Amino acid sequence: MRLSSTNMQARKMLFAAILSICASSSKKISIYNEEMIVALCFIGFIIFSWKSLGKTFKVTLDGRIQAIQEESQQFPNPNEVVPPESNEQQRLLRISLRICGTVVESLPMARCAPKCEKTVQALLCRNLNVKSATLPNATSSRRIRLQDDIAIKMHVLVGKRFCPWCSSKAERVEFIRESLVVLRMVWVGDSLKNKELE
């Protein structure tokens, strides 16, 4: 019954709109220009959407309103009185968390971790200091050992090369040139060392 009454009202409104368009037209023609066509199409679209999509929009909006109401009911109301059971549960939860923290802190690994970290840092620093202190001595001792080896080998080779029956004159000259090159390299290394010390 209600739907039939709304249909009758819509038809009356549409008929009134058509009559007003006819009355406003200069030549008493129902559809005269583009503006009238657009207005008539717009009125028809409104009536069609209201008839066909009105219930869908209403159901969607009702469902959304109900979902919002359910979500708002899940949040606690600040004006609502909290029951003593929930206060007791929160107190027990805080106590259990505090006990867990003390148990973890009392474990041997938890107690030893900071001490082990400090010990490892101290050991690494000491090793670095020892290596940095012994590095110049090691390089200088290696350089001295290298010079001694070169000198010993030079004496042996010179003794062998300068034997009158072991080598010819050309071989002796070539050996002297090689020896001068080696001595020049040693001299350059010593001069660089002196500059570093200065």
From Swiss-Prot:
UniProt keyword terms in alphabetical order: ATP synthesis, CF(0), Hydrogen ion transport, Ion transport, Membrane, Mitochondrion, Transmembrane, Transmembrane helix, Transport
GO molecular function annotation: proton transmembrane transporter activity
Regions that span the bilayer: 29-49
InterPro entries recorded: ATP_synth_Bsub_B/MI25, MI25_plants
Topology class, membrane: Single-pass membrane protein
Record's subcellular location: Mitochondrion membrane
Domain of life: Eukaryota
Keyword Ribosomal protein among UniProt keywords: no
One term under GO cellular component: proton-transporting ATP synthase complex
Gene Ontology biological process terms in this record: proton motive force-driven ATP synthesis
Function of the molecule: This is one of the chains of the nonenzymatic component (CF(0) subunit) of the mitochondrial ATPase complex.
Family: Belongs to the ATPase protein MI25 family.
Description of how the protein assembles with itself and partners: F-type ATPases have 2 components, CF(1) - the catalytic core - and CF(0) - the membrane proton channel. CF(1) has five subunits: alpha(3), beta(3), gamma(1), delta(1), epsilon(1). CF(0) has three main subunits: a, b and c.
Protein name, per record: ATP synthase protein MI25
Native source species: Nicotiana tabacum
